[in-house]
Amino acid sequence: MFLHNTKFCRLASGLAGGVRNLSGQKPKTAILMLNMGGPTHTDQVHDYLLRIMTDRDMIQLPVQSRLGPWIAQRRTPEVQKKYKEIGGGSPILKWTELQGQLMCEQLDRISPETAPHKHYVGFRYVNPLTENTLAEIEKDKPERVVLFSQYPQYSCATSGSSFNSIFTHYRSNNLPSDIKWSIIDRWGTHPLLIKTFAQRIRDELAKFVETKRNDVVILFTAHSLPLKAVNRGDAYPSEIGASVHMVMQELGQTNPYSLAWQSKVGPLPWLAPATDDAIKGYVKQGLKNFILVPIAFVNEHIETLHELDIEYCDELAKEVGVEEIRRAATPNDHPLFIDALTNVVADHLKSQQAVNPKFLMRCPMCSNPKCRESKSWYRQLCSN
């Protein structure tokens, strides 16, 4: 399903070790790529889960300081087993490093006035942790830092948590006064991102026999969200829907399609239908050929490599009688996607807008006091 990428294999070992600016020049523009991350090795799984389960931006639990660590401890063996089944760890760091390196190479060519550019990786729950990367950036003393969310569609639980962690870090650490800061918080409808997803889908459609091709269900799947968060006004579901709509426009509405939600945790109501339930439901209706499209993920990780590939495309498909099911690759290092990253940043650097006004808004029913403080802090930070 996935092509062997020699460029990725050649660069991966060096990039994963933290070699991010191959020229060694002092960067003028630092680009901090924010994401949740994933454990590179199974011995990192417990701490990764512990950070997730104690992050109230990501998940809210009763007596979280006690229940969160208990859940992390209990789930560690099960999650370690899943990582072993996909090769022993998450490739998200290697992909992010490669994406950042290729993006900065292009930025140096097309935007010499803001060069040299250097990418940095800031993960929320596993090394390289965002707060440690911020210290690395400060040592490099760039003129400008762009905080670039690697979640194309914004959610308070994902993008919001990453941005709140930066606010929390500088609440107890001195903020460098000689750096200009700006934010890219959402970019889920960027034309080149849309073209990337469309091409990934075309690649998989071409593998179906021609007589079935137009009947293949394109099933977009995104990480689910608790309805409690949706009802507060989180923009995530509408932004996912916008991405789906534009991808289908790019494809020319050639196939039946739908949107489902994966990776629910716990008993409370979340967005529905669940991806596995959607597959079961369509099979009952006589639709038995599918392409799964992870519309919210820009690189491979456990939720694509295990949940989609193993649990759904392999195990579930056999169980319910699917005829043929394929999974579109995430953008990874597709040339269109590297162009998308480059264009998003280049356009941002040329603009006079340091922060999207939407980012400075809170959800209409926001109940998180940290968000109020964080938004106020970012408003001031980006006005300097």
Swiss-Prot record:
Q: Which catalytic reaction applies to this protein?
A: heme b + 2 H(+) = protoporphyrin IX + Fe(2+)
Q: What are the alphabetically sorted keywords of the record?
A: 2Fe-2S, Heme biosynthesis, Iron, Iron-sulfur, Lyase, Membrane, Metal-binding, Mitochondrion, Mitochondrion inner membrane, Porphyrin biosynthesis, Transit peptide
Q: How is the cofactor bound?
A: Binds 1 [2Fe-2S] cluster.
Which locations, inside or outside the cell, does it occupy?
Answer: Mitochondrion inner membrane
Q: What class of enzyme is it?
A: lyase
User: Which residues of this protein are catalytic?
Assistant: H190, N343
Which GO molecular function entries does the Swiss-Prot or TrEMBL record give?
A: 2 iron, 2 sulfur cluster binding; ferrochelatase activity; metal ion binding
Its GO CC terms are: mitochondrial inner membrane; mitochondrion
Keyword presence, Ion transport: no
Tell me the residue numbers annotated for binding [2Fe-2S] cluster: C156, C363, C366, C371
Q: How does it sit in the membrane?
A: Peripheral membrane protein
Where does the sequence pass through the membrane? none
Subunit architecture: Homodimer. Homotetramer.
Functionally, this protein is described as follows:
Catalyzes the ferrous insertion into protoporphyrin IX. Terminal enzyme in heme biosynthesis. Contains four conserved cysteines that function as cluster ligands and play a crucial role in maintaining protein structure.
Family according to the record: Belongs to the ferrochelatase family.
Q: Which HAMAP family match?
A: Ferrochelatase (MF_00323)
NCBIfam families noted in UniProt? hemH (TIGR00109)
**What is the name of the protein in this document?**
Ferrochelatase, mitochondrial
* Organism in which the protein naturally occurs: Drosophila melanogaster (Fruit fly)
